[in-house]
Amino acid sequence: MKASEIREKDIVELNKELGELKSELFKLRFQLATNQLENPMKLKDVKKSIARVKTIIREKELSGNNK
């Protein structure tokens, strides 16, 4: 997911997206531990997406813009 796509969402949607990404990361880590993960790069992608969402949430909080 690109940062420009994330910026279009409001804080409520971003928090929902963050929860979904965290649960996906949990599932991927579980698959990695049980040697069922086919694509290890997926972990990196999900972690970066979580960081992007958190960064944009913080930007919106600091700017006072809840859109």
Curated annotation (Swiss-Prot):
Q: One MF term from GO for this chain?
A: structural constituent of ribosome
Matching Pfam families? Ribosomal_L29
Record GO cellular component, one term: cytosolic large ribosomal subunit
Could you give a single Gene Ontology term from the biological process aspect?
A: translation
Arranged from A to Z, the UniProt key words for this protein are:
Ribonucleoprotein, Ribosomal protein
What SUPFAM superfamilies does the record point to?
A: Ribosomal protein L29 (L29p) (SSF46561)
- Which InterPro entries does its entry note? Ribosomal_protein_uL29 (IPR050063), Ribosomal_uL29 (IPR001854), Ribosomal_uL29_CS (IPR018254), Ribosomal_uL29_sf (IPR036049)
Q: Which family does it belong to?
A: Belongs to the universal ribosomal protein uL29 family.
Know the name of this protein? Large ribosomal subunit protein uL29
Q: Which organism is it from?
A: Ruminiclostridium cellulolyticum (strain ATCC 35319 / DSM 5812 / JCM 6584 / H10) (Clostridium cellulolyticum)
